[in-house]
Every structure is written in C-alpha cells, then in structure tokens.
Amino acid sequence: MAGRSDWDYTRNGPSTWVERFPMAAGSRQSPVNIETDRAESDHEALSSKPLRWKYPASASRKLVNPGYCWRIDCDGEGTLLTGGPLMDDIYKLEQYHCHWGCSDSRGSEHTVDGQAFAGELHLVHWNTTKYRTFAEAAKAPDGLAVLGVFLKVGKAHEEMDKIARMLPYVSHKDEMIEIDDPIDPSKLLPVRGGRAGRCINPCMRWADRIIRPDNKCGFQDDNGYWTYLGSLTTPPCNESVTWVLFKKYIEVSHHQLNIFRNLRKFPRGEECPCHENHGVVINNFRPPLPLGNRVLRECGSF
C-alpha cells in the first residue's frame, strides 16, 4: 500500500493522485454520483439471494488514527457478508472507517442526485471464498465489498458515541487504542438494531417488519440499496470493490462530527503543518467520478 506521505486531501489531494497511482485514472473508479433515474431495478435478485451479514461486537479490536480518518480494525472472526450482488461468496469484515467534511453540509464521498451528506461510513470486507488474504483480494476485481452508509446530522447515535468517546485517545496520527467497550458494526447500519433515518428519496416506502433476524446468518435486508462495481476511494485506488450503498442514512449529532474534526493528521510531538487546515482531519473525501458505462443497480421497494 502507498505511504501516507505520497497523498492527502490538500496539496497532494485527489486531483494529483493519478501522478503517483495510475489506477486512479481507471474506468472503474469510486466514488460516483448515484443518479436514481439511471438505476436498474433488480428486485428478483434481491428476493432470491438477500444481502446478509453477521458482525459479532467482539470482532472490533482496535481504534486507529492513520492520519486521514478514524479506522476500526477487526479480526474478522465470526463476521460474514454474503448474498445480493455478492451471490454465494463469503466476505469477511476487515475494517471500518469514516469520511466527513469541515461542515455538516458536505462530507460524504458518494452523492445521490447531486446531494451530499455530512459523512459516509465504509465497512470494508474481503472475499474469503476465493482469496487467502486481504492483500491478495484487494488486487482482484471481485476481491472486496464495501457497505456504504450516509450520515446526516440529527440525534446523537448511541453506537457511534462509543467511537467518539475514544477518539481523544488517538488524537494524533499513528496512535491506536484497544477497544474495551464492544462496538457492534451492525448497529451502525440503517436497519433494525441501529438508529435509522428517513429514506433518501421521500417517495420511498419502508417497513421495518421486512427486515428480520436470520438465525443462520445474522441479519438479512430487503430494505433497499444501490450497488455497482468500483474501486477503493483512497490510493492506490484498486478497482476491486463491489459497492453496496444503503438508501437509508443514519443520524449522528453535530457534536459527534465535531469530535471527528478534532483528529490530527500529524504525529504527536511533531510541528503542526498549519498550511493544511491547521493539521486537523477534515474534508477527507474524494469527489465523485464518472460512472461511465457501468451498470448501477437498485435493490429494494419504492
């Protein structure tokens, strides 16, 4: 993977990444703008192989500040993502992290009909059916799967608050802390078990009763998502990701986002690079790129 000195979101920002990482100029790059009127309905695939996941809270092991976001690393044991666009392949949770802006109006990487959100949570998985390691999977076109969740400012999110309370302990780059109070990734999803917001499209109709526990495989969701083939949104921008973006968002508070914005992009003891947003981690999102001739599918009822 690339060294952090090779890229950032300011002087060495997204518009320059292609100079060091040629894959960033590929035709399967992420994020994209979700044009809802362009999405192809795929209700049959959803009903035949629903998207399913299982996330034991014990899998979340440590909170890390890599200098450009907060990230929770997982051991993957007992985790599972399958179904939907992933078909029968089994994916394991590797880590999850977040993107946000300097204000509550913009911070997501993907947009929906041009609308940005306050932030975007990414749960990154790798294909254990076909590949032996995350590194191997990251080089394959079907190696990774990322669940994307939009964040909107509203009420404080209880599970997200566990993360926010720990962030002062990893305030500077390269700091990390073991997680003592278990964090359940499934409670960060906009389905039953987490705090769900409204639908992004106000014309959509939803019913929590159709989201039900599945005894064999955690939760399964009929509640709606968009999916397309894309890439990692950070260098080296490998084109290895099947994206699943939930149509619902979760609410987080303004205070919680402000705690995110207090993270520092430089190590403790080093001089603050004050030419770069006073050294704080903000606007850590890549702008949307063309979808091109890729197929955007939607699963879920309107």
Language-model regions: role of each:
Residues 1-302:
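Alpha-carbonic anhydrase
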